[in-house]
């Protein structure tokens, strides 16, 4: 039987993978992907704890995070597309060009 610890371990591993991606990558698009992995890891943790405590608060938080992540993707992807059209690069080091 899969217990709460298994879900929390998977959640923690996914969060660490996302955090490593945030710290190691220089591509803006990969930073967005890493952020989504981290948010999904948090969702797994919330839903697992919610299931084992028979409380719906964790599932409500997970739905809230999913809606926030969807808006982040919509706005962020639009900004990334505009950034690529203007500078022909998705490198995070080229963000210094935005300084006024």
Curated annotation (Swiss-Prot):
Molecular function terms from GO: NADH:ubiquinone reductase (non-electrogenic) activity; quinone binding
Enzyme class, spelled out: translocase
Annotated membrane topology: Multi-pass membrane protein
Domain of life assignment: Bacteria
EC number: 7.1.1.-
Function: NDH-1 shuttles electrons from NADH, via FMN and iron-sulfur (Fe-S) centers, to quinones in the respiratory chain. The immediate electron acceptor for the enzyme in this species is believed to be ubiquinone. Couples the redox reaction to proton translocation (for every two electrons transferred, four hydrogen ions are translocated across the cytoplasmic membrane), and thus conserves the redox energy in a proton gradient.
This protein's name: NADH-quinone oxidoreductase subunit K
Biological source species: Helicobacter pylori (strain ATCC 700392 / 26695)
Gene encoding the protein: nuoK
């Amino acid at each position: 039987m899969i217990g709460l610890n298994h879900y929390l371990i998977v959640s923690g591993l996914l969060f660490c993978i996302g955090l490593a991606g945030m710290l190691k990558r220089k591509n803006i698009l990969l930073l967005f992907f890493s952020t989504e992995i981290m948010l999904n890891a948090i969702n797994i943790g919330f839903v697992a704890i919610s299931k084992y405590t028979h409380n719906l608060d964790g599932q409500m938080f997970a739905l809230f995070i999913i809606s926030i992540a969807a808006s982040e993707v919509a706005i962020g992807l639009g900004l990334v597309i505009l950034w690529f059209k203007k500078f022909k690069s998705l490198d995070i080091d080229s963000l210094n060009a935005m300084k006024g």
